[in-house]
Amino acid sequence: MNDAALAPDVSAALERGLQAQSLDTAFAAPLLRYLALLVRWNKTYNLTAVRDPRAMVTRHLLDSLAMQPYIASGMLADLGTGPGLPGIPLAITRPQLQVTLVESNGKKVRFMREALRHLELRNARVAESRAEALDEPTAYDHLTARALDKLAGIIAVGGHLLRPGGSLLAMKGIYPHEEIAALPEGWTMSEVHQLQVPGLDGERHLVVVRKA
């Protein structure tokens, strides 16, 4: 399947969503190529429980891109990225960002490598590893985690990757009061942004945590 095989309403929904997020609709073309590849591989390899391409636009692409106003450049490690979410959409829309996609599942790693080749995406690479085993201490300005763990758990497995003063950007549903209260020593909550994801009901928050 190529992007042309996706139904017209999928492309239209993505373009509307990009406009709502103040992003250039020129990004629709590479995002649709990524989506088409994900749909094709998902039929065989079960990379995501979301099957419908229109739902993928909202729940994967636009949800991932909701954090892009808060991260523009630097070195980013996306922990437990699965098939490349949010890392690949962020790499597409933020060319100044250098993204490392951290994932230990072999089939998801193979998919991401094919996606990067297919998209000719030069500002992203795949690290086939569990986050805690990645031997790149203090190499990153930012960490992201979309559905990995509670804040303390993310820090436990990936905190060593972040430079002092760097930021963890964690996607959450409802405001995570208890998780923020349980942050380990040396980590402080910097900002919490309530996110608006076009077409997605329910609360979404981006929690920004700083490393001392």
Swiss-Prot record:
UniProt catalytic activity: guanosine(527) in 16S rRNA + S-adenosyl-L-methionine = N(7)-methylguanosine(527) in 16S rRNA + S-adenosyl-L-homocysteine
GO molecular function: rRNA (guanine-N7-)-methyltransferase activity
Entry's EC annotation: 2.1.1.170
GO cellular component entries: cytosol
Residues binding S-adenosyl-L-methionine, per UniProt: 80, 85, 131-132, 146
Keyword Oxidoreductase belongs to the record: no
Localization of this protein: Cytoplasm
Keyword Nucleus: no
Alphabetic keyword roster: Cytoplasm, Methyltransferase, rRNA processing, S-adenosyl-L-methionine, Transferase
Main location class: cytoplasm
PANTHER family, per the entry: S-ADENOSYL-L-METHIONINE-DEPENDENT METHYLTRANSFERASES SUPERFAMILY PROTEIN
Protein function: Specifically methylates the N7 position of guanine in position 527 of 16S rRNA.
Membership in a protein family: Belongs to the methyltransferase superfamily. RNA methyltransferase RsmG family.
Stated name of the protein: Ribosomal RNA small subunit methyltransferase G
Gene designation per UniProt: rsmG
